[in-house]
A protein has these predicted regions:
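N-terminal glycine/serine-rich phosphate-binding loop of ATP-dependent small-molecule kinases
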Residues: 1-108, 155, 216, 238, ...
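Active-site core segments that coordinate phosphate-bearing ligands/cofactors
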Residues: 2-11, 15-16, 82, 120-176, ...
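Conserved small-residue
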Residues: 26-28, 33, 88, 115, ...
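A generic structural motif
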Residues: 42-43, 113, 316
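Short glycine/proline- and acidic residue-enriched helix-loop micro-motifs
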Residues: 52, 126-130, 218
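Short beta-strand-loop/turn "lid" adjacent to the catalytic site in phosphate-handling enzymes
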Residues: 75-112, 132-134, 167-179, 183-188, ...
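Conserved beta-strand -> loop -> alpha-helix junction used to position metal-binding or nucleic-acid-contacting
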Residues: 110-120
Length: 530
C-alpha cells in the first residue's frame, strides 16, 4: 500500500475516464497497469424533441462526480490527495453530433449514436462514397442537418464527438484519436487521416449550399495512439476537479471511442486478431490486414487506436432471451420447492446444451427482442419452431438458444471469412455469454470455426483501456507498436484459456444456420402479423 501511496504522491499514476451510455467511470492505474482506484457516476440519456441526448450540465456533473468518487476512494484507501498524474485519457461512446460556433457555443442539442433519423443522409453518402456510412456516424448527422435545412449549419466552426469535446475543454486542442475519428468520417488506412477523395466528394456534394467552411476545416485533427495530444490547462483542471487539488500541466493522450478502448482492454489491436463482446447486445471486431474488396452494408468499418482497419459486426440482440428461459426454469424449480441459485441454474442449463445434438436436433429458435438490420428483421419476436420429427430435448432446446444468440454475428463473420477471405488467428470472447466456463466459448469457436480465448478477468473494461493508452503515450519505447506494448508489458503471461473448434460442432452449427436462414421469413411474418 505504501508503494501505491508513493506512486500517487509522486504523480506516476495514470487516469482513464470513459463515458458509457449509462455510466461514467474513472480508473486509476499504477506503473504496472494494475487498477488501483476507481469511481463512477450513473446517468441516463433523455429523449427530447424526437432525439436522444445528454445535456452539457449532465456531461460536466457526471465527469466531476466520477472523478470526485475516484479521488475520495484514493483518499480513503491510501490517505493521499491526487495533485499530479503521469497522463490522462478520455474516451466515450462514439459517433453522434456535437457542433459548435466560433465562440465555442453548442449550436444544437448533442445527438447521441442512438439517433436513427439520418436514413436519407446515410443512403446518399453510401452511394457517393461506395463505403458503408451507418446511421450513427457523425458525417451522416451533419449531412442530415444539411438536408433538413437546419439554420445552425452555416455557423459551424468545429464538430466533434463526446470524447473530443471533453478533451478540447481540458486542453484547448481540437484533436481526436483515429479510432474515434473513424466513426465520424472514413479514414484512409495509409495516411491514418480522413480519406481525401471522400472529403473532396463531400465538399462537392454540398457546394451549392455556399457554407463558409469546408468539411475538413470543421473536423478534429486525427492523432494515433502514442501521439502527444495536449496539456491540461488551468481551466481544464478546475473543470475536472473543482476542489482545485489537481494541478495543470498533466499530459493528455488522444481521446478515443469506446470501441478502441475495448480493443485495448481485451488485447485485440494486432492485425488478424478479433474480439467478440457478448452481453445484452453482441458485437465482433476483426482487425484487418487490408481493406475489404466490396461494400457490405452489414459491416461497419472503424480503426484501432493505432490506425489498423477494423471490420465491426453489430447485433442488437444478445443474451436477453436466453436469460428469460433460464428465469422460466428457475420459476419452475421454485414452484416445486427446489432450492437452486441462479449460478447453478445457468451452469446446469448451459452445460446441458453441450449434451445436445450438434445441429440442435432440428429445433429452430430466434431470440430477437429488438429488430436486426443485418437479417432484415424489423421488430423483436422471440420464437421457437419445430417439426413433429424434431428431437425435442432440454439439451437441444438450450443448445438452439445458445446457437441463435450468435446467429447475426455468424452472418456478418461469414461475409468476412468466406466472401472476403479475411484470416483470423484467434478471437477473444468477453461478456455474460462466457460466464459459465467453457460453454459459450465452445459454441462460439464452432460457430465461427476459429479458436476462442477467454481471459480469467477482463480488467476494468474501457476506462482501464483508456488509462493504458495514457500510459503507453508516456512509457512506450521508440517505435514500439501498441500491439507489442500490450502483449509484452500489459497482458504478459495472462494468455487466458483457449478452446479450438471441433469439426462435428462446426458442421452442426452450419446445418443449424441453413435452417436459421430459411426460417427468417417466418420471423419477418411474425413481425408483420403479430
Amino acid at each position: 500500500m505504501s508503494n501505491i501511496k508513493e506512486i500517487i504522491e509522486s504523480g506516476k499514476a495514470f487516469l482513464g475516464i470513459e463515458f458509457g451510455s449509462t455510466r461514467i467511470k474513472a480508473v486509476l492505474i499504477d506503473e504496472e497497469h494494475n487498477p488501483i482506484a476507481s469511481g463512477s457516476h450513473t446517468w441516463e440519456n433523455r429523449y427530447e424533441n424526437g432525439l436522444w441526448t445528454y445535456s452539457l450540465d449532465d456531461i460536466w456533473t457526471g465527469l466531476q462526480d466520477s472523478y470526485r468518487d475516484m479521488a475520495e476512494n484514493v483518499q480513503k484507501e491510501y490517505g493521499v490527495t491526487i495533485k499530479k498524474l503521469g497522463a490522462i485519457g478520455f474516451s466515450a461512446m462514439m459517433h453522434g453530433y456535437m457542433a459548435f460556433d466560433k465562440e465555442g457555443k453548442l449550436l444544437a442539442p448533442f445527438q447521441t449514436w442512438r439517433n436513427s433519423n439520418t436514413g436519407k443522409a446515410s443512403e446518399v453518402l453510401v452511394d457517393l462514397f461506395r463505403y458503408n456510412i451507418p446511421l450513427r456516424w457523425s458525417i451522416a448527422h451533419l449531412y442530415q442537418c444539411i438536408l433538413d435545412k437546419e439554420e445552425h449549419v452555416k455557423d459551424i466552426a468545429f464538430m466533434t464527438t463526446l470524447a473530443g469535446y471533453i478533451h478540447w475543454q481540458m486542453t484547448g486542442e481540437k484533436v481526436l484519436g483515429v479510432g474515434d475519428a473513424s466513426g465520424m468520417f472514413p479514414i484512409d488506412m495509409n495516411t491514418k487521416d480522413y480519406d481525401e477523395e471522400m472529403i473532396q466528394k463531400f465538399d462537392k456534394l454540398i457546394e451549392g449550399e455556399n457554407y463558409p467552411w469546408k468539411v475538413k476545416e470543421i473536423l478534429p485533427k486525427v492523432l494515433v495512439a502514442g501521439d502527444a495530444a495536449g496539456i491540461l490547462t488551468e481551466e481544464g483542471a478546475k473543470k475536472l476537479d473543482p476542489t482545485g487539488n489537481l494541478e495543470a500541466g498533466i499530459p493528455l493522450c488522444p481521446p478515443e471511442g469506446d470501441a478502441g478502448t475495448g480493443m485495448v482492454a481485451t488485447n485485440s489491436v494486432a492485425q488478424r486478431t478479433s474480439n467478440i463482446s457478448a452481453g445484452t447486445s453482441f458485437f465482433s471486431m476483426v482487425v484487418l490486414e487490408k481493406p475489404l474488396k466490396d461494400l457490405h452494408t452489414e459491416i461497419d468499418m472503424v480503426t484501432t487506436p493505432d490506425g489498423s482497419l477494423v471490420a465491426m459486426v453489430h447485433s442488437n440482440n444478445g443474451t436477453t432471451d436466453l436469460n428469460a428461459w433460464v428465469n422460466l426454469f428457475k420459476e419452475f424449480a421454485d414452484s416445486i420447492g427446489a432450492d437452486v441459485d441462479m449460478n447453478q441454474m445457468y451452469g446446469t442449463l448451459y452445460n446441458k446444451a453441450l449434451e445436445g445434438d450438434a445441429d440442435c436436433g432440428g429445433i429452430l429458435s430466434y431470440g430477437n427482442y429488438a429488430g436486426e438490420p443485418i437479417t432484415n428483421v424489423e421488430k423483436g419476436r422471440p420464437m421457437v419452431v419445430r417439426t413433429p420429427e424434431t428431437k425435442f430435448t432440454l439439451a437441444n432446446f438450450m443448445r438452439s438458444h445458445l446457437y441463435t444468440a450468435l446467429g447475426v454475428i455468424k452472418v456478418g463473420m461469414d461475409i468476412l471469412t468466406k466472401d472476403e477471405g479475411v484470416e483470423i488467428d484467434t478471437v477473444l470472447g468477453h461478456g455474460g455469454l462466457f460466464k459459465t466456463k467453457g460453454v459459450g466459448q465452445k459454441v462460439l469457436a464452432d460457430a465461427i470455426n476459429t479458436p476462442v480465448v477467454v481471459m480469467e478477468t477482463a480488467g476494468e473494461g474501457g476506462p482501464w483501456g483508456m488509462a493504458i493508452l495514457a500510459e503507453y503515450m508516456v512509457k512506450r519505447a521508440e517505435g514500439e507498436k501498441l500491439g507489442d506494448y500490450l502483449k509484452n508489458k500489459v497482458f504478459g503471461s495472462n494468455a487466458g484459456s483457449r478452446i479450438d473448434p471441433d469439426p462435428e460442432g462446426v458442421a452442426g452449427y452450419e446445418a443449424f444456420m441453413e435452417t436459421y436462414k430459411k426460417g427468417l421469413d417466418v420471423e419477418r411474418r411474425a413481425c408483420a402479423d403479430l
